[in-house]
């Protein structure tokens, strides 16, 4: 039985995220147990962001030329290698090596499957509304994220009999499980994803399908030119920079923050890790609710996706500030979940706005440009917020992050005003589609 486009995308991406986040609830704690401080963690995670940023556009252009499926599988295998390096890392140099390999992996995989999914949907129905499709896909991915973090949080407790020092410790078990899971996902992608040869899609490859370096860099140049010419893309990418920064501040700092709220738990020996898994798993679980709220709110507001995005950004900023000021485990957990709910709600309307501005032939490279913006922000967030947390407190870093994300609602208000001026009240496209969506005019 052949799976549909939606079924294939939902299955592969949800399993991918399940395997990827198995160690996420304890990964920072594992690095700390091997003598790495918060500032050093910010440094190697910042390097990861730099590597992704440098490779994003070339790798996205390469994926458009060589095929999204092939790029995704190669990136998945590099991801496995990166996790092996982390498993064996005991000093900053090794963690920096991990960051380089992981960055190369992320650059290859980012946007590859999403581009395949969007193009396949639009081939079936060019007028399809992408927001509910992306929200549904996001919900399936969040199920994988939630289950993966819960399982990863439970594994150290189940293997608490292992020594607290060495390669295979309780905190390292989720990483080992993740390596196996990612290998399975790469194999599934190879079997389930069906893609036309890039030459058939682009009509630009030579008879043997060989890639020419000049073509790749020409594709990159077109993407850069598109961003320079489009004020709407620049505003959307600016928000991606901010989200990248605050997400880095959240992911790098939440484990030590919540570990201090678990008095008496020997985390290095596996104590309290299930609670951390519940914290992170629950955050992804409420993200499903965020997708539902985004879809309902978009409908209620006439598919004004820019306005919906602005509302979620302000709410997310407030959640970060209150989280920073909280001091009790249950209250902090609820507020942490709220940051994920609002960020999940923001994602699909933001992505819908972005995809309106992009044409099929450059979709992967433009998604790479979007990812580049996010990781450029992540570099700043990792280094700056990590250093600020070590010099002051994690709470101070999160207050700064909250103020920044709330301020990022302004670009959406500008976009919403442009949309309302550009479309007559009775124009059916005023409910959310780009004014030039039907013809492709004005898209990049």
Outline where the language-model segments fall.
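Helix-loop boundary and gating motifs at the non-cytosolic
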Residues: 1-54, 87, 92, 232-280
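Juxtamembrane intracellular "pre-TM" segments in multi-pass secondary transporters
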Residues: 1-3, 193-238, 430, 435-443
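C-terminal transmembrane bundle of multi-pass solute transporters/carriers
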Residues: 1, 14, 42-46, 53, ...
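C-terminal ends and interior cores of transmembrane alpha-helices
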Residues: 77-91, 95, 314-327
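Hydrophobic core of transmembrane alpha-helices in multi-pass small-molecule transporters
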Residues: 14, 82, 93-109, 330-345
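Glycine-rich segments within core transmembrane alpha-helices of 12-TM secondary carriers
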Residues: 134-156, 373-381
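Cytoplasmic helix-loop-helix junction between adjacent transmembrane helices
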Residues: 100-142
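Helix-loop junctions on the cytosolic side of multi-pass membrane transporters
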Residues: 171, 178-207, 413-427
């Amino acid at each position: 039985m052949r799976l549909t486009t939606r079924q294939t995308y939902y299955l592969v991406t949800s399993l991918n995220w399940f395997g990827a986040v198995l160690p996420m609830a304890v990964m920072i704690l594992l690095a700390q147990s091997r003598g790495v401080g918060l500032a050093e963690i910010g440094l190697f995670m910042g390097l990861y962001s730099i590597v992704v940023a440098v490779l994003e556009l070339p790798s996205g252009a390469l994926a458009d030329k060589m095929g999204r499926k092939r790029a995704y599988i190669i990136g998945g295998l590099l991801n496995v290698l990166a996790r092996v390096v982390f498993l064996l890392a005991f000093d900053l140099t090794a963690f920096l090596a991990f960051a380089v390999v992981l960055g190369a992996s992320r650059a290859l995989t980012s946007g590859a499957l999403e581009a395949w999914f969007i193009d396949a949907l639009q081939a079936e129905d060019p007028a399809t509304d992408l927001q509910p499709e992306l929200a549904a896909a996001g919900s399936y991915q969040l199920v994988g994220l939630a289950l993966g973090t819960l399982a990863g949080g439970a594994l150290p407790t189940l293997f608490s009999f292992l020594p607290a020092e060495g390669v295979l410790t309780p905190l390292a078990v989720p990483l080992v499980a993740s390596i196996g899971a990612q290998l399975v996902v790469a194999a599934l992608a190879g079997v389930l994803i069906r893609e036309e040869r890039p030459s058939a899609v682009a009509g630009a490859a030579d008879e043997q399908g060989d890639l020419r370096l000049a073509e790749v860099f020409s594709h990159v140049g077109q993407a850069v030119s598109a961003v320079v010419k489009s004020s709407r893309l620049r505003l959307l990418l600016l928000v991606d920079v901010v989200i990248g920064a605050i997400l880095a501040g959240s992911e790098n700092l939440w484990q030590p923050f919540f570990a201090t709220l678990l008095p008496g738990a020997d985390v290095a020996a596996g104590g309290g890790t299930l609670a951390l898994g519940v914290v992170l798993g629950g955050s992804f679980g409420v993200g499903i609710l965020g997708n539902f709220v985004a879809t309902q709110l978009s409908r209620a507001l006439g598919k004004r996706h820019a306005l919906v995005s602005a509302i979620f950004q302000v709410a997310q900023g407030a959640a970060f500030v209150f989280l920073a000021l909280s001091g009790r485990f249950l209250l902090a957990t609820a507020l942490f979940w709220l940051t994920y709910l609002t960020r999940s709600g923001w994602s699909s309307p933001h992505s819908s706005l972005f995809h309106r501005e992009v044409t099929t032939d450059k979709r992967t490279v433009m998604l790479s440009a979007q990812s580049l913006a996010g990781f450029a922000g992540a570099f700043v967030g990792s280094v700056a917020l990590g250093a600020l947390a070590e010099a002051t407190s994690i709470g101070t870093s999160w207050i700064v992050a909250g103020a920044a994300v709330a301020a990022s609602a302004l670009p959406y208000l500008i976009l919403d005003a442009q949309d309302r001026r550009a479309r007559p009240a009775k124009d059916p496209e005023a409910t959310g589609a780009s004014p030039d969506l039907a013809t492709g005019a004005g898209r990049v």
